Amino acid sequence: MHNGSPIIRRKSTRIYVGKVPIGDGAPIAVQSMTNTKTTDVDATVAQIKALERVGVDIVRVSIPTMDAAEAFKLIKQQSTVPLVADIHFDYRIALKVAEYGVDCLRINPGNIGNESRIREVVACARDYNIPIRIGINGGSLEKDIQEKYGEPTPEALLESAMRHVDILDRLNFDQFKVSVKASDVFLAVNSYRLLAKQINNPLHLGITEAGGARSGSVKSAIGLGLLLSEGIGDTLRISLAADPVEEVKVGFDILKSLRIRARGINFIACPTCSRQEFDVIGTVNALEQRLEDLITPMDVSIIGCVVNGPGEALVSTIGVTGARNHSGFYEDGVRQKERFDNKAMIDQLEAKIRAKASILDANNRIVINQLDDNK
């Protein structure tokens, strides 16, 4: 029930990764990357499908060898989500996966080779109508740039990016996005800020090698949160040493927190104290697991007492305010006569949330149909 985001997004050009629009006001796409052996086709396809179930928009797949490229052909045939091929060192792999229907090529200027090789990749991308991501990384800058700056700096990452943007510009190829990732939050943020002032192409955001599930999520939330709040960013990936499914969940949580893109339940829950009248933590944990399948955006407040409960419930789709034995229930900010038994809270809340999601989905379908009729 909160209003939309106050963030004014940076203007950028539009490209498509598969059928997913990127830039020019399109919803910020959430990306992840498989961490299976690409030559293990079954395992890779299974992971891609798991990512699809939690809402991933785009999946990147590492293609380190020609054997992996052959495996990619089979993976692509079994996938419905757009796939990006991650290419390092051997530009010929990019040419091969283009034949097999890849939706985007990610090349690393630090190791892809000289300009003649880039020209071949661009020519191939043009022939197959495939966009490119110029993926700069603070850990793999070109040797001459490393020597010039001594260490990764925002200016170094910018120079690497602009060098290759200029190449694509000279080749009259504009179907590309750019990233300037680093594992240090300040280095990444300042690199993206510099780049955003130089080009109007879409930007892919990420704090690379951010760490494990907890620390990596925190770093990514800080770094990407800063950039997104400034309107910078068109796609993102949360790079975690964890199950890639967690990357997608964290990515959507960041977008949801900034009210940029809503998907699923936004839980508002108190940290609890001795005033709580029911098990808030257990209730929230159980509902997060039970309601993972819901994609309908809604705010659900679960507050253990009457200090902040009524106020949060007023701006929530569904709200619960703790009281002795039976807690107050709110819908669309209005207190209902019905009360929840504190001992049966989880089942009752789940039923109410699912019922509300069905109503909201039905209303959305009506609106969409009316818009289609008016076209």
Curated annotation (Swiss-Prot):
It comes from the Bacteria. Keywords: 4Fe-4S, Iron, Iron-sulfur, Isoprene biosynthesis, Metal-binding, Oxidoreductase. Pfam families: GcpE. It is an enzyme of class 1 (oxidoreductase). Pathway: Isoprenoid biosynthesis; isopentenyl diphosphate biosynthesis via DXP pathway; isopentenyl diphosphate from 1-deoxy-D-xylulose 5-phosphate: step 5/6. [4Fe-4S] cluster binds at residues 270, 273, 305, 312. Binds 1 [4Fe-4S] cluster. Transmembrane segments: none annotated. Its cofactor is [4Fe-4S] cluster. SUPFAM superfamilies: Enolase C-terminal domain-like, Nitrite and sulphite reductase 4Fe-4S domain-like. Its EC number is 1.17.7.3. GO terms for molecular function: 4 iron, 4 sulfur cluster binding; 4-hydroxy-3-methylbut-2-en-1-yl diphosphate synthase activity (ferredoxin); 4-hydroxy-3-methylbut-2-enyl-diphosphate synthase activity (flavodoxin); iron ion binding. GO terms for biological process: isopentenyl diphosphate biosynthetic process, methylerythritol 4-phosphate pathway; terpenoid biosynthetic process. Belongs to the IspG family. Converts 2C-methyl-D-erythritol 2,4-cyclodiphosphate (ME-2,4cPP) into 1-hydroxy-2-methyl-2-(E)-butenyl 4-diphosphate. This is 4-hydroxy-3-methylbut-2-en-1-yl diphosphate synthase (flavodoxin). It comes from Yersinia pestis.
